[in-house]
From Swiss-Prot:
Function: Transcriptional regulator that acts as a mediator of the integrated stress response (ISR) through transcriptional control of protein homeostasis under conditions of ER stress. Controls the outcome of the unfolded protein response (UPR) which is an ER-stress response pathway. ER stress induces QRICH1 translation by a ribosome translation re-initiation mechanism in response to EIF2S1/eIF-2-alpha phosphorylation, and stress-induced QRICH1 regulates a transcriptional program associated with protein translation, protein secretion-mediated proteotoxicity and cell death during the terminal UPR.
Post-translational modification Phosphoserine, affected residues: S345, S464
Protein name: Transcriptional regulator QRICH1
Effect after changing S736N: In VERBRAS; uncertain significance
Region of interest (Disordered), residue spans: 139-164, 218-240, 419-441
Amino acid sequence: MNNSLENTISFEEYIRVKARSVPQHRMKEFLDSLASKGPEALQEFQQTATTTMVYQQGGNCIYTDSTEVAGSLLELACPVTTSVQPQTQQEQQIQVQQPQQVQVQVQVQQSPQQVSAQLSPQLTVHQPTEQPIQVQVQIQGQAPQSAAPSIQTPSLQSPSPSQLQAAQIQVQHVQAAQQIQAAEIPEEHIPHQQIQAQLVAGQSLAGGQQIQIQTVGALSPPPSQQGSPREGERRVGTASVLQPVKKRKVDMPITVSYAISGQPVATVLAIPQGQQQSYVSLRPDLLTVDSAHLYSATGTITSPTGETWTIPVYSAQPRGDPQQQSITHIAIPQEAYNAVHVSGSPTALAAVKLEDDKEKMVGTTSVVKNSHEEVVQTLANSLFPAQFMNGNIHIPVAVQAVAGTYQNTAQTVHIWDPQQQPQQQTPQEQTPPPQQQQQQLQVTCSAQTVQVAEVEPQSQPQPSPELLLPNSLKPEEGLEVWKNWAQTKNAELEKDAQNRLAPIGRRQLLRFQEDLISSAVAELNYGLCLMTREARNGEGEPYDPDVLYYIFLCIQKYLFENGRVDDIFSDLYYVRFTEWLHEVLKDVQPRVTPLGYVLPSHVTEEMLWECKQLGAHSPSTLLTTLMFFNTKYFLLKTVDQHMKLAFSKVLRQTKKNPSNPKDKSTSIRYLKALGIHQTGQKVTDDMYAEQTENPENPLRCPIKLYDFYLFKCPQSVKGRNDTFYLTPEPVVAPNSPIWYSVQPISREQMGQMLTRILVIREIQEAIAVANASTMH
């Protein structure tokens, strides 16, 4: 396409515009020529900048052509569907020897009801001399509306025992009676269209291996094209490029072209060195594409040897219905792969047939809105890496999604073993259900498959029930569980009472109140005990221990919020409940998935602060808080370790900031593993475990709570070296100077407190980090 800016812009701006059309691999040559030749370099690069090129990178020859997209240089290629099929009579062979002959035939048949265009290229390559390439265009129809020109172009030929088989591109669309012009066809006269392309190419290698390339692509216009009177015009060659829905003309590199309306498709293939000159490109020179169509997903595959493969998946759509367009480009590095299989479609269909009749598209379930499949099999010398041949290695796959304004469809990427012959999938295998709204990236190496599911960016991901972890307590959930259990239990009691004789004295049947607030202490204690064993979720399954503990914390918060002062975890009236709960929680270990991931607990530290199980609300709560901090920071995980803790072994230390003497920091320290240190050994700072201040929240500061605990303890026990946790007084006033007796708590009581602490998520994480650091 001629540049129309030469006479309207400055020379420097013209150079910048011209540089954007120079391919990246020729940019250095362009700059050197510009410095030496001056304006003559612009004329030299004027013709080569917009033509297709083949250059070598690594072991492959890359087919490239410059394309200007929204004012920047971008090599844009959209995939077409490919699959491997046996050779048919319609496919024409290409024998590689040093003579080469290429014939391209274009036939367009037209009737008042249907217009079909069939392009059937045959490539025959022999390796000794030069023969011309013939391009024949034949147009047949019931009305004299087209012509059939013929073009001959020179071509180089080269010998080889290889053979390229194939290529058949069929383009069909149904429309009302109209004329087909060699220049363009208005889209408003074509409500529906269908494109079916097949490209098969094969080459017999030295070892007898046969590799074939076949492409099949089908596309249909969005509904906006069907209903609007003027949506624009498009022109397309045999390998065409996605363009926005607006009127545009594109110059073809050859003089004879035909135009159809619809959504074209282009592909980029890796061409072997021996066939660089035998590839004929019919792609338009220049196009303009809406830059709003960006990427949808990127897959990165890293092999055990450190090789990284990046699989960018580009999804581009016109300004039509986003649900009716899905075009994908898969780019694979050239170094370490042999075959790539790409398929994507929102509905199920194997043989792609898009009927342009409105009624058929609405009424026929076998018609798809968009379906494509692509197999790109390289013929280069570098095959699949040797470490992937056995198919028994692990391939980590990372998928990153970028939200877009379109609806994603299922996409699958298969990387096959080079020794395996690709097989065409059945309709059920290659297309997921229409309701599926996920992208799947599946990498297969012989016997091993790694699959990563990516949720559609438009919809919020629905995590599994195991990952629905609450961040705070919800009292209504605890009340709901209690009501459901009470209703079930009351029904069981009534059923049992009907089967038994009435007791002497006509005692009233036991019934549990569904309202927690009106329940008596004894009834609530008994009901909570039974709930530890009988509570069930909506599916009739028993709750996990940490979930059950979470429910009881919700009940505790509900009681506090509604005026009840009962502490079901520390009051003497609920001792039986705490014993039953201890039996449920004592054997709890962090749950690990089959892949080795640790599932976090439902209970968090924040939840205990919410329901007043941590803090200085009561003597029992303060004692539990100190045990929590000692477990979290001193990493005391067993009852024996806590029993060894003593007032004399916990040191309070204050440090001054050297730069600012008024800035002081206070901490409490505990000598770790006191028994393993030898007598007379010098004690260093790394031998101590430390708890530091929390100046942001004094009510949750370990140092201030420790000082408050010392303040409430009897003076006679503050220097003891055999105890740290004292027994709370049963009844005390908040302003009482003494909250604890001189007796230490029992081992059983300490075990129950520690069991509930070890279920907390932050405690489990701290222990896991400490264990991981000791292993290293």
